[in-house]
Amino acid sequence: MFNSVNLGNFCSPSRKERGADFGERGSCTSNLYLPSCTYYVPEFSTVSSFLPQAPSRQISYPYSAQVPPVREVSYGLEPSGKWHHRNSYSSCYAAADELMHRECLPPSTVTEILMKNEGSYGGHHHPSAPHAAPAGFYSSVNKNSVLPQAFDRFFDNAYCGGGDAPAEPPCSGKGEAKGEPEAPPASGLASRAEAGAEAEAEEENTNPSSSGSSHSATKEPAKGAAPNAPRTRKKRCPYSKFQIRELEREFFFNVYINKEKRLQLSRMLNLTDRQVKIWFQNRRMKEKKLSRDRLQYFSGNPLL
């Protein structure tokens, strides 16, 4: 009934045909990236290393001489020229050895030096310690054990007369200077007491009718006031004519002055605010007294 149909036309091309077709196209595009291709992994083991083990020319670094070597010595065993912690006994012993070699001191004095400096390293220092050390030790060892030797002269000036050395002349001079002024006040007090006694004698002569109780009462304050300094009255500072004229002019217009005007006057007259305030208070009291005197004079009434 049906004509025979060649199914090969409807089927996909065979594997051989596809391979031939792919080979033709692959020759054209051999240098293109194909997803189905595997990646090439080179073998670097066969290639020689870039830096040989024994280079023919040594590379010199310019900063190699400036880099300090690695410190393998402990901190306590370093030479005593460096600054150390105050509780490191190893530095104390190193300092003693260096001093012994420098000053050529016998071994017996080294123990004295260690005992002398034990307080400065251990923290238990007594200025009046009986241990003695040779004079050469103080010439080479710092007096402060922290700062360099150049700072010893400052410690000599600051702590004069302290510890082992005798008192220096500047300190003794200061003590003498302090002790000398103490004598004049005694003589001055004596003269003041004599002057007070003379004044009391004059009062007795002028007032013979005064009772004994009042005399003793006046004598006790005199004795108590003798040791104290005499009360000197504050020196009066009179105002100049220009200041008085300006103050009187302001008082003529305003008997009571406000704060702003008071500050203005104090700046203009080179006075303090308190001086202007007190002057106006005194001037008001004076004006009150003058007005009362005028009223008494014109009225003829003495009771006013």
Swiss-Prot record:
Stored PROSITE patterns: HOMEOBOX_1 (PS00027), HOMEOBOX_2 (PS50071)
Key words, A-Z: Developmental protein, DNA-binding, Homeobox, Isopeptide bond, Nucleus, Transcription, Transcription regulation, Ubl conjugation
Record feature DNA-binding region, as residue ranges: 232-291
Source organism (scientific name): Mus musculus (Mouse)
GO BP field: anterior/posterior pattern specification; embryonic digit morphogenesis; embryonic skeletal joint morphogenesis; metanephros development; organ induction; proximal/distal pattern formation; skeletal system development
GO molecular function: DNA-binding transcription activator activity, RNA polymerase II-specific; RNA polymerase II cis-regulatory region sequence-specific DNA binding
Family stated for the protein in its record: Belongs to the Abd-B homeobox family.
Annotated compartments: Nucleus
Taxonomic lineage from the root: Eukaryota, Metazoa, Chordata, Craniata, Vertebrata
Crosslink feature (Glycyl lysine isopeptide (Lys-Gly) (interchain with G-Cter in SUMO2)) location: 82, 116, 178
Primary subcellular site in the record, as a coarse category: nucleus
GO CC terms: cytosol; nucleoplasm
Protein name: Homeobox protein Hox-C11
